[in-house]
């Protein structure tokens, strides 16, 4: 019963805040707010240049492997649990899926910086 009440309150608050943010007028919109900020100086060129898709993909790959490290760091403490076989199986599957993804990226030249 408590979980349902908390869920209802959270949903109501979220919807209320979204509604208020949507209906409030946007005040003080002028060109200076839309411009780029370069340490107080006027920008020398356009700051809205698109960046390379390769850079984006390498960044996403880095984030995935960073997440892998955070998932594998508590593994030595998990080995002290009663079900060591299941822990090893799950960690092996995680590393295997990520290794297969890395091999796929490597064979399709997704990790090369130059085109």
UniProtKB/Swiss-Prot annotation:
One of its GO terms (biological process) is mitochondrial electron transport, NADH to ubiquinone. It is an enzyme of class 7 (translocase). GO terms for molecular function: NADH dehydrogenase (ubiquinone) activity. The keyword Coiled coil does not apply. InterPro entries: NADH_UbQ/plastoQ_OxRdtase_su3 (IPR000440), NDAH_ubi_oxred_su3_sf (IPR038430). Its EC number is 7.1.1.2. Pfam families: Oxidored_q4. It comes from the Eukaryota. It is found in: Mitochondrion inner membrane. Keywords: Electron transport, Membrane, Mitochondrion, Mitochondrion inner membrane, NAD, Respiratory chain, Translocase, Transmembrane, Transmembrane helix, Transport, Ubiquinone. It is a multi-pass membrane protein. Its main location: mitochondrion. The chain crosses the membrane at residues 4-24, 55-75, 84-104. It catalyses: a ubiquinone + NADH + 5 H(+)(in) = a ubiquinol + NAD(+) + 4 H(+)(out). GO terms for cellular component: mitochondrial inner membrane; NADH dehydrogenase complex. Core subunit of respiratory chain NADH dehydrogenase (Complex I) which is composed of 45 different subunits. Interacts with TMEM186. Interacts with TMEM242. Belongs to the complex I subunit 3 family. PANTHER family: NADH-UBIQUINONE OXIDOREDUCTASE CHAIN 3. Core subunit of the mitochondrial membrane respiratory chain NADH dehydrogenase (Complex I) which catalyzes electron transfer from NADH through the respiratory chain, using ubiquinone as an electron acceptor. Essential for the catalytic activity of complex I. This is NADH-ubiquinone oxidoreductase chain 3. It comes from Eligmodontia typus (Highland gerbil mouse).
């Amino acid at each position: 019963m408590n979980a349902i009440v908390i869920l209802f309150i959270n949903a109501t608050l979220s919807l209320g805040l979204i509604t208020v943010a949507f209906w409030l007028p946007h005040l003080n919109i002028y060109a200076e707010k839309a411009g780029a900020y370069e340490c107080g100086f006027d920008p020398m060129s356009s700051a809205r240049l698109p960046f390379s898709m390769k850079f984006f993909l390498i960044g996403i790959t880095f984030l995935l492997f960073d997440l892998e490290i955070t998932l594998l760091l508590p593994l030595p403490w998990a080995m002290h649990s009663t079900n060591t076989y299941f822990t090893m199986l799950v960690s092996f599957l995680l590393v295997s899926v990520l290794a297969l993804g890395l091999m796929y990226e490597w064979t399709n030249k997704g990790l090369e910086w130059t085109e």
